Amino acid sequence: MGLEDSVKQLQGAIEELKGLISSVEEMKEIVKRESEDSIQEYLRSFLEPLAKDNPLFTQKHIFGKYKPERNEKKCSHIDGNYWPHLKHTFHPQLNYIVDLLEEIRNCTCKEKQHDKQLVPLPTPAESSKKPEECTNNCNCDKCRQKEKCLTIGEMSELLQNLIKIPKQSKYLEKPALF
């Protein structure tokens, strides 16, 4: 009888181990499924406000299934980059400023090119005049400098000079104890 009892105990222990193994496998599946769901929820909570803040993204872009829509507006008066939103960030005000600077730069360059085509080239006598006596159709260095098209970097430097932002020190100052 001792042998039969020990065999039954071993069979019972084996059944318990099988039950534990199956419950561990079930727990692994539950943990895996829950982690995927929590990751999806985290991504959804992160991406939804971005889509609301940036008008280039719509609800179908939330999960990255589609690329941002291009602005199909025709810009016949603008040369160069037709898609300035390729430089966009998720900050709408910054996007607006980048678009505005790009349009100003392109439009002014286009107007200057158009004006140069309408105005005849100056004669050597006109170009040898002093800078104080310059006219609108002059070709001297001072006028060429004014006609130079600004890059986005130069325009942003001009804006930074207009808006004085106080520089903060790299290190926090310790408050005086006494």
Curated annotation (Swiss-Prot):
Recorded superkingdom: Viruses
Protein name, UniProt field: Uncharacterized protein 3
